[in-house]
Amino acid sequence: MASLGGDNSQAEGAEVRHVPVLIAEVIDALKPAPGAVIVDGTFGAGGYTRRILETGADVIAIDRDPTAIEAGRAMEKEFPGRLNLVESRFSALDEAVARMSGAGKKVDGVVLDIGVSSMQIDEAERGFSFQKDGPLDMRMSSGGPSAADAVNRLKTGDLARIFNFLGEERHAGRIARMIEKRRAAKPFTRTLDLANAIETLVGRNPKDRIHPATRVFQALRVYVNDELGELARALLAAERILKPGGRLVVVTFHSLEDRMVKRFFADRAGGSAGSRHMPETHMRLPSFTPAVKGAVGPTPEEEERNPRARSAKLRAGIRTENPPLEDDLSLFGLPKLPETNELARS
């Protein structure tokens, strides 16, 4: 996706539209070459895909948002036979590759840009923005429960945990209790209704760079779209479909996602199984080696040009010849939150 970036992404840089973040660093880490096959798991406005295609590589581009896929049809015509658009969750990118290229097909690279796209924020009717009035939706696709469903149906304690863990909101409990009280009189259905209620409760320091509702909106979006679960499953899927020497490049904008990616690459570096509490059981061969040292951030010039890039971090790994390690979602430390499918039935 052409991601917005950090927590204050709606407050700053509003004039910057659909600018791919860390594009030079992404291309340098990905190293696409003519004839290579690259998966862009988060197509969005197509910024990464276009630059990859310009190197001569072919792209399988995935997005769960049908609006993004439809907008990308023009690019598909611009690069005939070299761009395949797939409407799908990026957690199923291995299935998308099999559908496009055949079962067992491996690829040369995978790039993931984690977060909401600027196209989605800019369209008030999608309900992602706390600065524009629209339905309280936030779904990246049309299926499943909306943010309004979560706000109006979840228990107060569950809302507080979502705001705390997924949004790192320090007023999580107060906001959840306010929502419980207000929704009893009138359900929340509009973005500005919720944003204004939060601002009234928490207050706003003129020196604050972010709106008081920023972290709550982030948490609801991440919850409704299962963004952390999607990322975890996408990393494991990328491990399965990359050729030896293939590269996985991930750009994140929040500490939650960055910690998950960091933990994944550290785990996939192999080594002994076990911990200080348990004896070592066996040696695990690495499935990835580092492609860059640590996390790469934007240059001062990019931050000035595009404030949305300020919180971006890039991590990348190179696939080894060793088989994939076990699919273990527990390594990501995801919290136990109410299932959205249960919410849809409530």
From Swiss-Prot:
The keyword NAD does not apply. Its EC number is 2.1.1.199. InterPro entries: RsmH (IPR002903), SAM-dep_MeTrfase_MraW_recog (IPR023397), SAM-dependent_MTases_sf (IPR029063). It comes from Brucella suis (strain ATCC 23445 / NCTC 10510). S-adenosyl-L-methionine binds at G46, G47, Y48, D63, F90, D113, Q120. Residues 270-346 are annotated as: Disordered. GO terms for biological process: rRNA base methylation. This is Ribosomal RNA small subunit methyltransferase H. The keyword rRNA processing applies. Belongs to the methyltransferase superfamily. RsmH family. Keywords: Cytoplasm, Methyltransferase, rRNA processing, S-adenosyl-L-methionine, Transferase. The gene is rsmH.
